[in-house]
Amino acid sequence: MKKVLAFFAEGTEEIECLMVVDILRRAGVSVELIAVAPENLVKGSHQITVLCDKNISELSENDFSAADLLFLPGGIPGVPHLEENKKLLEALQKQFQAGKDLAAICAAPGILGRLGFLKGQNFTSYPGFEEGISGVEGAKWSGKAVEVGQQIITGRGMGVALDFALALVERLEGAEKAAQLKKGVQHPECIV
């Protein structure tokens, strides 16, 4: 069974995170929602309190390395809070160096860019958050809804959270599973 760690800090965009967690779990992926905060009850950017499965302080290096994909949702001030966490940044570095997948949506691709992971790659993000990253060492902001690279998948924002989540399902469980879920959740493209 594939494993994903999804990180949730104070001020995270709730829909971007929980849509991905929900869709991945529907696909049969083991997803742990990780609090990047003092407590496991974390308030998102729209004052919705989320009970996370574990706290980042509880995770060992083995917990991180067992994950097939690490996921960073967007939201302000959630993204700055994620980026302040040294343990998370170290885990992202190790995941990237191991050739494993990373995913980020909205403002969160900026974290990957500032870590140097977007060199020579197309990426997308919420408009404005590409500044200082696009053009640096060949990183190119495409502006697409979802950008799927060899190791990194990025999404533009909350409005594309379902399509972003389905792209992660396709990466982890294959195109057939993603198509089944797309139809099952009544994605607009499947309604005739």
Stretch-by-stretch model annotation:
Residues I34-D53:
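N-terminal beta-loop-helix "entrance" segment that forms/cooperates
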Residues K3-F8, T12, R26-A35, K54, ...:
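Active-site-adjacent pocket-lining segments in enzyme domains
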